[in-house]
């Protein structure tokens, strides 16, 4: 489980395509602290398992279906990604509970900035909208947001 509070913005160093999956190599610093092989890190909100660690990066396998269905379809080298380690039972809980399993994708169709906030209008399919409630939480690229107007 994750909280939707991004710890760090990492950078995709390499994507190696395999027959059934791809291996992502992601440059990071903060999320590597205390992380072990087998731990979970959310990459743009998608729960991935760390398969190897380096001083400045980690790798994770991603199934092709995940790459094609989720917001990772446009992933490329040098792209920046939101990173968050799995929440700890004894840690602070901000944001909301984020499983790291993607229900669907949407498209930002309008952005409005005012003195206190940035407002996004996001369009998605009706089968996704039925799960979104006014004043409820939603994770966009792993970021915990509140749905204001439906």
Language-model segments: residues:
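Conserved loop->alpha-helix
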Residues: 1-150
């Amino acid at each position: 489980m994750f909280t939707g509070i991004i710890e760090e913005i990492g950078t995709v160093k390499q994507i190696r395509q395999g027959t059934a999956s791809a291996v992502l190599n992601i440059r990071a610093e903060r999320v590597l602290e205390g992380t072990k092989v087998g731990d979970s890190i959310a990459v743009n909100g998608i729960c991935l398992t760390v398969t190897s660690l380096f001083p400045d990066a980690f790798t994770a396998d991603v199934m092709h279906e995940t790459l094609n269905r989720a917001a990772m379809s446009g992933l490329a080298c040098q792209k920046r990604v939101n990173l968050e380690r799995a929440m700890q039972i004894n840690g602070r809980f901000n944001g909301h509970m984020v499983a790291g399993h993607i229900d669907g994708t949407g498209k930002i169709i309008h952005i409005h900035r005012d003195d206190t906030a940035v407002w996004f209008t996001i369009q998605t399919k009706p089968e996704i909208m039925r799960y979104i409630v006014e004043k409820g939480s939603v994770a966009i690229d792993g970021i915990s947001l509140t749905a204001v107007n439906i």
